[in-house]
């Protein structure tokens, strides 16, 4: 399989999907359902480029839900939460009130790995060396779930990325190891994809048609 040609073709196809918005809405739902009930409080993601699925709206809803649940649990007066209180929470910084954090990658130029910095809507951003927006001077977080973009994906939970190796090098150094979840549209399925020795299988892959891959649970 020519990965360079496959990568180029899939990116071009993704950019020109006539129903990309509908696919994105479906994948948002799949992602939120997959996250339901997970106890994790720090999730790493990415800033979408080249027509990638945008995971940030679903993650912000996840963070917002956790904030409201925390507020409700602290309301020990047994009185209903007033509408104006909910409105106040909505207008305050969810990121500051929430027990949950969202991290976006920042490239470590020395080690060629990724460090995750806290992100929230409206946080200060700057472009990295590749022109991709990244959080500016926010706290470093260590994700226990890591959503990664897939150009393509194949059997066994392996992904086709951009060929830079940043995620594979990062996963080799993160401790504890996070649960890794690929995100991509179903047109990226590559049935004949063959992983290389340095490729690391993901724990799950989600697409607009549902859970495309889920690693068996270990005893």
Where are these regions (language model features)?
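Surface-exposed, charge/polar-rich loops and edge strands
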Residues: 1-5, 12, 137, 141-146, ...
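N-terminal active-site beta-alpha-beta segment that forms phosphate/nucleotide-binding
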Residues: 1-141
């Amino acid at each position: 399989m020519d990965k360079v040609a496959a990568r180029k073709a899939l990116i071009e196809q993704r950019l020109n999907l006539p129903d990309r918005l509908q696919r994105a809405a479906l994948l948002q739902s799949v992602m939120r359902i997959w996250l339901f009930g997970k106890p994790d409080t720090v999730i790493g993601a990415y800033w979408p480029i080249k027509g990638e699925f945008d995971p940030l709206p679903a993650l912000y809803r996840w963070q917002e839900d956790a904030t409201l649940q925390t507020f409700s649990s602290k309301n020990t007066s047994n009185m209903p939460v007033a509408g104006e209180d909910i409105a106040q929470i909505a207008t305050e910084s969810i990121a500051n009130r929430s027990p949950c954090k969202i991290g976006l990658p920042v490239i470590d130029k020395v080690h060629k790995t990724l460090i995750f910095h806290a992100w929230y809507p409206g946080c200060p951003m700057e472009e990295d060396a590749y022109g991709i927006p990244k959080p500016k001077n926010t706290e470093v977080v260590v994700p226990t779930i890591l959503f990664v973009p897939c150009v393509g994906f194949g059997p066994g939970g392996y992904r086709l990325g951009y060929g830079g190796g940043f995620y594979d090098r990062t996963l080799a150094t993160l401790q504890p190891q996070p649960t890794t979840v690929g995100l991509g549209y179903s047109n990226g399925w590559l049935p004949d994809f063959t992983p290389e020795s340095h490729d690391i299988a993901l724990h799950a892959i989600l697409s607009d048609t549902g859970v495309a891959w889920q690693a068996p649970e270990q005893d």
